[in-house]
């Protein structure tokens, strides 16, 4: 029985196959001669050949390049020697400051010096041998500390207003303790320093809290402090000027009272100004309006009194005949 096989390919498909058989792959180059008689031989571009013979990698093409990524020995030795060198420099500076660097050394001192050299040598060997371990530990520690500092900084920035008040209250307590010691006679300070305690406390507050306060808040704080200081300066000038014109001066108790009043007033005004911006301006306006109201009331009373007196005088100037006519009517 004959097998009648009819190809399903069209003439156009057969022409395409012939063209592709004669085309050259630009990436692989021309096909080498293939000997089908050799056993196990496969075409060089077959998938099986590519799996069995993978292409050379960059590392295989460059066998002379080292695959070890660890640091060279000299760099390890130098980095390991750095902390020991810094520690020895600090020790030398301390001994020089104490004037005891290689001066009047006896047997005990030289023995201690030799032991120190032995410890430094062993530490250098240990750090060099376990270089990767302690470097990794240092990196982890530094990263952890950096994260802690970042978290603390963010927390302080978020509570900067509360931190200002806490620092201010702490400094108030310190100043009150100062006053107690001065009053008991255990501490002698200049009265001018006592009078300017609020200034010192404000400056310390600004220095300490400037780390966690934005610049615009810092600038506003300076402006409010300047207002408080101007007000205090005016009060001090008025009081001392008045006493000077009268030929008198404050005794110790008077200076303490003045200092206490200025201290309490300055701190209260500064806190009020920080808590309620514009408190000093509103206080000034309120005082001015109050004085104006009082003066206006006094003026109105004087005007009413003047009108009453003028009305009484007008009645006294009426002729007697007119008064009789008015009475008859």
Swiss-Prot record:
Keyword Coiled coil applies: no
CC annotations in GO: cytoplasm; fungal-type vacuole; vacuolar membrane
Compositionally biased residues, Basic and acidic residues: 19-30
Main localization, broad class: membrane
Domain of life: Eukaryota
Localization annotation: Spore membrane; Vacuole membrane
InterPro entries: WTF
Ranges where the record places region Disordered: 1-68
Membrane topology field: Multi-pass membrane protein
Record-level GO BP terms: meiotic drive
Keyword terms: Membrane, Transmembrane, Transmembrane helix, Vacuole
TM helices/strands, residue ranges: 73-95, 110-132, 165-182, 192-214, 290-312
Family indicated by similarity: Belongs to the WTF family.
Role this protein plays: Acts as a suppressor component of the dual wtf meiotic drive system, and can suppress but not confer meiotic drive by compatible poisons. Wtf meiotic drive systems promote unequal transmission of alleles from the parental zygote to progeny spores by encoding a poison and an antidote from the same locus; the poison is trans-acting and forms toxic aggregates in all spores within an ascus, wherease the antidote is spore-specific and targets aggregates for degradation by the vacuole.
Subunit (UniProt): Homomer. Interacts with other proteins that exhibit high sequence similarity.
Name of this protein: Meiotic drive suppressor wtf21
Organism from which the protein derives: Schizosaccharomyces pombe (strain 972 / ATCC 24843)
Gene expressing this chain: wtf21
């Amino acid at each position: 029985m004959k097998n009648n096989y009819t190809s399903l390919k069209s003439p156009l498909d057969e022409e395409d196959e012939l063209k592709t058989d004669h085309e050259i792959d630009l990436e692989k180059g021309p096909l080498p001669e293939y000997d089908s008689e050799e056993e196990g031989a496969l075409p060089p571009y077959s998938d099986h050949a590519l799996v069995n013979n993978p292409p050379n990698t960059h590392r295989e093409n460059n066998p002379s390049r080292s695959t070890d990524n660890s640091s060279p020995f000299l760099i390890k030795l130098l980095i390991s020697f750095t902390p020991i060198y810094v520690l020895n420099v600090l020790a030398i500076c301390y001994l020089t400051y104490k004037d005891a660097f290689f001066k009047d050394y006896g047997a005990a001192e030289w023995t201690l010096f030799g032991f120190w050299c032995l410890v430094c040598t062993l530490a250098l060997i240990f750090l060099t041998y376990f270089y990767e371990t302690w470097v990794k530990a240092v990196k982890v520690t530094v990263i952890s500390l950096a994260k802690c500092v970042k978290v603390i900084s963010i927390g302080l920035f978020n509570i900067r207003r509360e931190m200002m008040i806490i620092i201010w209250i702490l400094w108030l307590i310190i100043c009150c303790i100062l006053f107690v010691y001065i009053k008991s006679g255990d501490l002698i300070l200049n009265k001018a320093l006592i009078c300017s305690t609020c200034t010192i406390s404000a400056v310390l507050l600004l220095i300490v809290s400037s780390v966690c306060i934005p610049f615009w808040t810092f600038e506003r704080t300076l402006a409010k402090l300047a207002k408080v200081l101007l007000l205090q300066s005016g009060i001090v000038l008025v009081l001392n000027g008045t006493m000077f014109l009268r030929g008198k001066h404050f005794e110790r108790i008077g200076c303490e009272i003045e200092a206490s009043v200025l201290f309490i007033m300055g701190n209260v005004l500064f806190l009020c100004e920080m808590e309620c911006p514009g408190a000093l301006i509103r206080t000034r306006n309120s005082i001015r309006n109050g004085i104006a109201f009082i003066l206006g009331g006094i003026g109105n009373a004087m005007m009413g009194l003047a009108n009453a007196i003028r009305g009484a005088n007008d009645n006294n100037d009426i002729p007697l005949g007119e008064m009789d006519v008015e009475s008859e009517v």
